[in-house]
Amino acid sequence: MITLAVDAMGGDQGLAVTVPGATAFLQAHPDVHLIMTGDETQLRQALTAAGAPMERIDICHTAQIVGMDEAPQSALKNKKDSSMRVAVNQVKEGKAQAAVSAGNTGALMATARFVLKTIPGIERPAIAKFLPSDTDHVTLALDLGANVDCTPEQLAQFAVIGSELVHALHPQKGQPRVGLVNVGTEDIKGTDTVKQTYKLLQNSKLNFIGNIESNSILYGEADVVVADGFVGNVMLKTIEGAVKFMSGAIRREFQSNLFNKLAAVAALPALKGLKNKLDPRKFNGAILLGLRGIVIKSHGGTDETGFRYALEEAYHEAKSASLSKIEQGVAEQLAALETAKAVQNENVGGL
C-alpha cells in the first residue's frame, strides 16, 4: 500500500480542487491510502459530498493555512500547524512516502528543505518537471525557479540528481542523456558559469551530450536538461505561453468562417489527439528534487484533473522507490564530480 500525504487546503481553490482530484485518483488506484491535512470539519464534509472512499483516507486536522502570497520565512516560523507543514511532516515521520501540495511555492520549498533536509552532497534542492516532446519521450527539466543564481558545482549537482531520478523511474532507458541549456551548442558559448559547468559535466560519469538550445528541448534530444532557476523558469513560462498561444490560434482559425468550421469537423480526431498531448494538466506536478523525501508541487491554479496528475507523479515516484535509488547513485556521481573539479582546477593552475 502506498501512502501519500495531501495538503488539502493549499492552492487557489483549496478543497474545491484537492478533494475531487484526490477522490478520482483513489478510484483509479486501489493500492493507495491518503493522509489529508486541513480543517477536519470542512474536509470531512467535502469528502463525503464527493463520494470519496473514506476507508482509505485519514484526516489530520490542522488549524492553519499558508497563504498563497505569504513570505516563506513567515510561513516557516508562524505556521507550524498549517496543512502544508503537517503534510510534509508525515514524510519526515515515515507515515507517508510522499507529500503533495498546491500551496505557495516558496513556502513549500522552505518548509520541505527545513523539515526533510537535502541529500548529502547536494547543496540546494531544485524544482524539476517532466516536459512533453514530439514523440512519447519526456524530458526532465531543472531548475525551474528555486535557485536563480547558481555556481557551476550546484548546476552539476542538479545534473546528477536529475539523471538519477530519470534512471530510477525509467531504468530500461539506460544512462540518461544530460544536456546543459545554453545560447548555442558550442562549448565556447555562454556565461563563465555555464562554461565551467560544461567542463565539470564533460569530465563526470554522467552521459553528458553537451549544450542544448531551448528550441530543441521538446524534440526529445535529451532526457535531462539543466539550467539555473532564472533561465529554467523563463524557459518553462515561454513553453507554456507558446502552447497556450498555438492552441488559441488554432481554435480561432477553425472558428473564423463556415469553411474552416467544416474542416474542423474533419480534423476533429487529430485536434483531440493534439489537445490531449499538449494538455498542461497532464504534466502538472513539479518535483522538489534533492530532498531526503518526496515532495510534489502542484500548480496553485490547476483544476481537479491537474491535481490528480500531481498525485500520479507522487505515486509513481513512491512506487518506484526513486528516493532510495537516487541517494545510492548520487554519492558515486558526486565523487566523480569532485575528481573532475580537481582536474579542472589543476589545468587552470597550470596555465
Curated annotation (Swiss-Prot):
Keyword NADP set for record: no
Catalyzed reaction equations: a fatty acyl-[ACP] + phosphate = an acyl phosphate + holo-[ACP]
InterPro entries attached to this UniProt entry: FA_synthesis (IPR003664), Phospholipid_synth_PlsX-like (IPR012281)
Keywords of this entry: Cytoplasm, Lipid biosynthesis, Lipid metabolism, Phospholipid biosynthesis, Phospholipid metabolism, Transferase
A single MF term (Gene Ontology): phosphate:acyl-[acyl carrier protein] acyltransferase activity
GO cellular component: cytoplasm
UniProt cross-references to Pfam families, sorted A to Z: FA_synthesis
Compartments where found: Cytoplasm
GO biological processes: fatty acid biosynthetic process; phospholipid biosynthetic process
Entry EC number(s): 2.3.1.274
Pathway: Lipid metabolism; phospholipid metabolism
Top-rank taxon, per record: Bacteria
Predominant localisation class: cytoplasm
Gene3D superfamilies reported for this sequence: Isopropylmalate Dehydrogenase
Oligomer status and interactors: Homodimer. Probably interacts with PlsY.
Function: Catalyzes the reversible formation of acyl-phosphate (acyl-PO(4)) from acyl-[acyl-carrier-protein] (acyl-ACP). This enzyme utilizes acyl-ACP as fatty acyl donor, but not acyl-CoA.
Record family assignment: Belongs to the PlsX family.
Protein name: Phosphate acyltransferase
Organism of origin: Neisseria meningitidis serogroup A / serotype 4A (strain DSM 15465 / Z2491)
Lineage start: Bacteria, Pseudomonadati, Pseudomonadota, Betaproteobacteria, Neisseriales
